[in-house]
């Protein structure tokens, strides 16, 4: 960190997003990078053509440029996306959560949760205060409007699950993650199930 900006907006976004994610983990959890041993955070941008995705490949971040004609912006420009993918690296280093079935849903939820956390850290001015807004609970709202997923109301995307049922492990992990995402939202913010599937008010 600390280097001058380049002329490439997406290089700058990946650089700043990775830096903010590192800072958030360090400030709140005293974690030194994804391996807790100071590993460098490496990113590649402009991957492929019309590629609306980003991923952790086991050693570094990879960002597509999106597909603007279909409303998908360059992936490096989403702070929660960067933190989400880097959290996959943390999970890879710290847990045995395989990337399939119910375990995969928890893996994805962990990334969404820390994506939201890091966004709140940045919105709080990176001062140690978390600023939470309606956008905090939207995943990828800066990439594909109105959002990719909704932690406070997972079913709003038309696919994510918001309560446990038998066989949920057969659902795409990006959608089964909604169960843990909503649990985290309710634990941190309080309230009831957004679609009336429980009568318990979490306080």
Walk through the language-model features, giving the residues of each.
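Surface-exposed extracellular loop regions of Gram-negative outer-membrane beta-barrel proteins
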Residues: 85-91
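Zinc-dependent metallohydrolase catalytic domains
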Residues: 8-80, 91-203
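Acidic/histidine-rich, surface-exposed loop or edge segments in extracytoplasmic proteins
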Residues: 1-8
């Amino acid at each position: 960190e600390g280097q001058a900006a380049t002329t490439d907006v997406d290089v700058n976004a990946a650089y700043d997003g990775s830096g903010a994610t590192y800072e958030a983990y360090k400030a709140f959890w005293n974690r030194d990078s994804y391996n807790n041993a100071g590993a460098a955070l490496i990113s590649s941008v402009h991957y492929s053509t019309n590629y609306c995705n980003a991923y952790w490949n086991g050693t570094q971040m990879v960002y597509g440029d999106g597909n603007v004609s279909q409303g998908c912006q360059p992936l490096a420009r989403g702070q929660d996306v960067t933190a989400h993918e880097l959290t996959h690296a943390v999970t890879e280093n710290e847990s045995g959560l395989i990337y399939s079935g119910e375990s995969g849903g928890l893996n994805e939820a962990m990334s969404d949760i820390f994506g939201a956390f890091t966004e709140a850290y940045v919105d709080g001015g990176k001062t140690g205060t978390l600023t939470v807004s309606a956008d905090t609970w939207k995943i990828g709202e800066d990439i594909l409007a109105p959002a990719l997923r909704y932690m406070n109301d997972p079913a709003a995307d038309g696919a994510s699950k918001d309560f446990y049922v038998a066989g949920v492990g057969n659902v795409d992990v990006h959608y089964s993650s909604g169960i843990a995402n909503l649990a985290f939202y309710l634990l941190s913010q309080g309230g009831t199930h957004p679609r009336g599937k429980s009568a318990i008010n979490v306080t």
